[in-house]
């Protein structure tokens, strides 16, 4: 076999980046085309090149001298030479650069056009279009980061004194609210930083990826609104705005202080539902948090002389807040705790003690149901399991609070109540708003329990009326209710609570009732004993206080409301319905009390009449 010595191409030292896998690929291609016949290797010439390049040179010399392989090898060599020349040219330019700006300009041009020549018109248009598209894409995907970046630029370029002097951020917020139908010239938006030279009132919060607003003051004389916010964290999303969900997604408010007219606030929230600009910003909020806030609520339009209601919010966390489902979303809160005139209230999920038993009952009910719980009927399965889900029932509890604080006796519904305390406990079941049911099938069931203690009444000049002006009961129908409450309050007074209260007992109404009897309890030791060294009183006392709170009237009612009726905040309509239910339950209690008193009187009269007949009969016989 004749072995022909080929002319081996000289591999220069700058061509070191050539890799062995390219050579192996060429060898595999040659072997496949020649059916495995490979020419023997020829000993390479002596060279000072590295071992890797020598191996590559050895493989190249073994290839046949056909035109296809020669063209491919020459193309590879040309590409490698061009890249090496470009790299050497860039290194020479960087070496000649005098400062950082020139080096940055060279590197930037090399990334964009691989040269140091001036930009052409086509290249400038391409770069500008890519910059605009990237900014739009950034604005859609991460709106909060986009706005935070430009806020950072503004705060870095301009001084804070200049920003406060020109009121840049105040004008920006007023411009966002200028098209709202309830906004007017009386709305004042200001910032009150502690140090105007250093305080950033509007700045990015990089840790929480939100926009931070500090020391915001909002005041409106027509709406009777004056609120101060310590700081607010906002998250915005242009993507949600394009989908019709609103621009603002998450809101965290800390430290609200000020006063607010409740009637005007309700009208303001109701007006938001018909305003397109407001819905563009606040249609659906995914997460709302309010912490450490205290607001003085004015309950009437002319509430300057009347005392305000101190409403405190310790912690409020809403997974979602929608303008058209404001009440239902508030009642579906994860956490809602606070106080009303120092009376604590809390909204929480009801805890089931017999969860396992309830789950078994649900399974048995679903097994006996007419629905076929297969993969084809997943909607029916979700419907039944949701209706039987006990965790969806929330409980609202308000501790005992004076009725004068809630203004029950000043709105005309309970104008015959003078004093007392009320405790409210409500179990609320809400239909899942995300279910496939129609809007007519979504409802809210409220099981209300009102506990009244130490009630004091007075006979009014006018009968109680609803907010619409309709009469609830007449004055004649109100008389037995007032008599029952006064008698009930007198019957439940602690008898002989202390020897110093004898004067109070002599004027009590219980001594004017013929059906009152005193049942003394047995002697007992006090729970706690306080004895001083110079005390002459006895340690053991007679305790005649009742063990239970007998001076309590418990009213219960159940109310069913369609969720479509709760889209607008109509407090008067809800209170009117609750008032009617409470009056019905109170009337039943009074009727039972009258029936019991009548039976007791009949028994006593019959016993007295029979005893008199017996005495007169024995006297006649004698």
Curated annotation (Swiss-Prot):
- Which residues make up the transit peptide? 1-70
Identify the keywords attached in UniProt to this record, alphabetized.
Answer: Membrane, Mitochondrion, Mitochondrion inner membrane, Transit peptide, Transmembrane, Transmembrane helix
Main localization of the protein?
A: mitochondrion
- Membrane-side (Mitochondrial intermembrane) residue stretches: 145-601
Instruction: Please provide the Gene Ontology terms (biological process) for this protein.
Output: mitochondrion inheritance; mitochondrion organization
Q: Where in the cell is it found?
A: Mitochondrion inner membrane
Q: How does it assemble?
A: Interacts with MDM31. Participates in a complex of about 175 kDa.
The UniProt similarity line reads: Belongs to the MDM31/MDM32 family.
Q: What's the name of the protein?
A: Mitochondrial distribution and morphology protein 32
**What is the source species?**
Saccharomyces cerevisiae (strain YJM789) (Baker's yeast)
Question: What is this protein's gene name?
Answer: MDM32
């Amino acid at each position: 076999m004749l072995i022909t010595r080929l002319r081996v191409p000289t591999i220069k030292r700058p061509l070191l980046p050539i890799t062995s896998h390219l050579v192996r690929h060429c060898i595999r291609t040659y072997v496949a085309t020649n059916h495995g016949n490979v020419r023997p290797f020829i000993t390479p010439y002596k060279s000072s090149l590295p071992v890797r390049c020598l191996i590559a040179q050895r493989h190249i010399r073994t290839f046949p001298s056909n035109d296809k392989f020669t063209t491919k090898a020459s193309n590879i060599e040309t590409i490698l030479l061009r890249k090496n020349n470009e790299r050497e040219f860039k290194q020479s330019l960087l070496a000649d650069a005098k400062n950082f700006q020139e080096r940055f300009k060279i590197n930037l041009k090399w990334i964009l056009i691989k040269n140091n020549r001036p930009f052409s018109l086509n290249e400038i248009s391409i770069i500008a279009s890519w910059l605009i598209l990237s900014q739009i894409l950034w604005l859609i995907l991460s709106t909060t980061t986009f706005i935070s970046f430009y806020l950072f630029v503004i705060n870095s370029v301009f001084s804070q004194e200049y920003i406060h002097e020109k009121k840049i951020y105040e004008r920006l917020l007023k411009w966002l609210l200028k098209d709202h139908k309830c906004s007017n010239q009386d709305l004042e938006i200001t910032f009150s930083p502690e140090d105007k030279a250093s305080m950033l009132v509007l700045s990015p919060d990089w840790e929480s990826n939100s926009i931070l607003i500090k020391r915001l003051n909002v005041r409106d004389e027509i709406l009777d609104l004056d609120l101060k916010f310590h700081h607010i964290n906002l998250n915005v999303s242009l993507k949600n705005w394009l989908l019709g969900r609103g621009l603002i997604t998450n809101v965290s408010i800390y430290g609200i202080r000020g006063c607010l007219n409740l009637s005007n606030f309700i009208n303001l929230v109701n007006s938001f539902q018909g305003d397109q600009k407001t819905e563009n910003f606040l249609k659906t909020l995914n997460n709302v948090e309010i912490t450490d806030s205290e607001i003085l609520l004015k309950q009437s339009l002319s509430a300057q002389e009347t005392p305000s209601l101190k409403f405190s919010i310790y912690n409020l966390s809403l997974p979602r807040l929608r303008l058209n489902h404001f009440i239902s979303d508030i009642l579906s809160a994860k956490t809602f705790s606070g106080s009303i005139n120092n009376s604590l209230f809390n909204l929480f999920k009801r805890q089931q003690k017999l969860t396992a038993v309830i789950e078994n009952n649900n399974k048995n009910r679903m097994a006996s149901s007419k629905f076929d719980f297969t993969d084809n009927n997943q909607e029916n399965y979700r419907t039944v399991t949701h209706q039987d889900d006990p965790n969806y029932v929330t409980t609202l509890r308000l501790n005992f609070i004076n009725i004068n604080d809630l203004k029950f006796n000043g709105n005309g519904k309970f104008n015959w109540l003078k004093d007392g305390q009320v405790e409210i406990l409500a179990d609320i079941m809400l239909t899942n708003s995300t279910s496939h049911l129609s809007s007519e099938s979504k409802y809210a069931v409220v099981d209300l329990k009102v506990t009244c203690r130490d009630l004091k009444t007075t006979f009014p000049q006018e009968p109680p009326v609803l907010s619409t002006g309709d009469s609830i009961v007449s004055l004649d129908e109100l008389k037995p209710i007032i008599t029952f409450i006064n008698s009930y309050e007198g019957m439940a007074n602690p008898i002989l609570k202390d020897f110093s209260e004898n004067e109070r007992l002599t004027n009590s109404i219980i001594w004017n009732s013929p059906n009152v009897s005193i049942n003394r309890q047995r002697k007992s030791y006090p729970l706690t004993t306080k004895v001083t060294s110079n005390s002459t009183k006895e340690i053991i006392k007679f305790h005649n206080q009742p063990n239970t709170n007998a001076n309590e009237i418990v009213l219960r009612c159940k109310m069913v409301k369609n969720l479509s009726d709760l889209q607008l905040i109509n407090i008067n309509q809800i209170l009117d319905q609750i008032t009617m239910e409470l009056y019905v339950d109170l009337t039943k209690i009074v009727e039972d009390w009258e029936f019991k008193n009548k039976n007791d009187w009949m028994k006593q009269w019959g016993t007295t009449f029979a005893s008199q007949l017996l005495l007169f009969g024995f006297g006649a016989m004698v």
